[in-house]
Amino acid sequence: GFRDVLKGAAKQFVKTVAGHIANI
């Protein structure tokens, strides 16, 4: 459903942000 898509996008966003923070 729409909520699952939102959850997936949020998870991916957190992963990307965490990756950027780790690169600093």
UniProtKB/Swiss-Prot annotation:
<comment type="function">
    <text>Antimicrobial peptide that shows higher potency against Gram-negative bacteria than against Gram-positive bacteria. Has a very week hemolytic activity.</text>
</comment>
<keyword id="KW-0964">Secreted</keyword>
<comment type="similarity">
    <text>Belongs to the ascaphin family.</text>
</comment>
<keyword id="KW-0044">Antibiotic</keyword>
<keyword id="KW-0878">Amphibian defense peptide</keyword>
<protein>
    <recommendedName>
        <fullName>Ascaphin-2</fullName>
    </recommendedName>
</protein>
<keyword id="KW-0929">Antimicrobial</keyword>
<dbReference type="GO" id="GO:0050829">
    <property type="term" value="P:defense response to Gram-negative bacterium"/>
</dbReference>
<dbReference type="GO" id="GO:0005576">
    <property type="term" value="C:extracellular region"/>
</dbReference>
